[in-house]
Amino acid sequence: CIIEIIDGVQVFRLSAFKTVDIGNIKRGINEILLPFIMLYRILKSNFPIKELNAIVWYSPTIFFGPLVKVLKSSSNCPTYLILRDIFPEWALDLGILKKDPIYYLFKLVAKYQYSVADIIGVQTSSNLKYLESWVKKPNKKLEVLNNWLSLAHSQKTSISLTDTCLNGRKIFIFIGNMGIAQGMDILIDLAESMKNRQDVGFLFIGRGTEVENLQTSASDKKLDNILFYNEIDSKEIPSLLDMCHIGLIALDPRHKSHNIPGKFLTYMQAGLPVLARLNEGTDLVDLIKDENVGRVYIGNEVGDFRNLAEDLIDNENNLKAMSERGHFLSQKMFSSNHAAKQIVSSLSSYI
């Protein structure tokens, strides 16, 4: 256990098993073991387990229920679960899981995690329906807690496009996780459909289970308007986005649960209009349209998607206006200060 002081706050850091960039089976085992390893190391340290005023934790993962239960019982304090992914439901939607014993086991684990929470904050109003039975239990509170993004501390990016095939082009950028849940293939198809436009390029930054497949697809299609880079330090992102023009968002249309990806907040903070391919019914569709900060597509026809892309990139005056609205939206709805105040206010009613 390592103890640090960050901005006047005492932080206990615990070593943990790796849960990213590994196979699904190993990841599952590591996530199952993680809360028990953390609890063991907490109990072996000087962590003030009986002096907690509140517990706030984040999901994914679904496996922290036992850890939170012990901490809550020791301190007799209220708990707040920030619920971002409705798992295992989204994995069922995408065909990753079937309604077999494994699915029902995960569902039971998630249900237990919900049971130790006094308050649950979901990302969008569309996700409230998944917890209708939970909120009917005594002393439970369910609310929408918007995603948030702190003000970025910028440093010069390590990525330079000057000597690449994207030099001088208007850049569509995707930054973040590239996995099954994103449904990224349509972005490669979009790049292929625009390969004859020498003024447009595509930049993909991040990691995930689908990166290698996406790179192979781009190579097979002989695309010279697309580049891939591994994830970079978050402090480099603002200066990187300064070189770009449109932020890309993709969610697999089979999703039935809904969220607002963190990359949307990143783009808004940077003043980048967005081109989003989303699942039907998600709150982000209406948000982008109502605030007029980009274009949204629901479907699988790359020609229609391209039309929206060109509508964005070819209208510089509109891009500038969208950029200004994005900055305003970021400050209005997605500040970390607003989220912190909401969490503290909700917990205060239980103290």
Where are these regions (language model features)?
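Conserved donor-binding/catalytic core segment of Leloir-type glycosyltransferases
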Residues: 149, 163-182, 188-191, 203, ...
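Nucleotide-sugar-dependent
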Residues: 182, 233-240, 247-268, 274-286
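An aromatic- and histidine-rich active-site surface loop
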Residues: 27-42, 52-77, 81-84, 89-90
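A short, well-ordered alpha-helix in the C-terminal region of glycosyltransferases
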Residues: 304, 311, 318-333
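Carbohydrate-associated surface elements
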Residues: 126, 145-148
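Nucleotide-activated donor-binding/catalytic signature segment of Leloir-type glycosyltransferases, i.e.
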Residues: 203-206, 211-238
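Membrane-proximal helix-turn-helix segments that form the acceptor-binding/catalytic region
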Residues: 43, 63-66, 70-74, 100-120
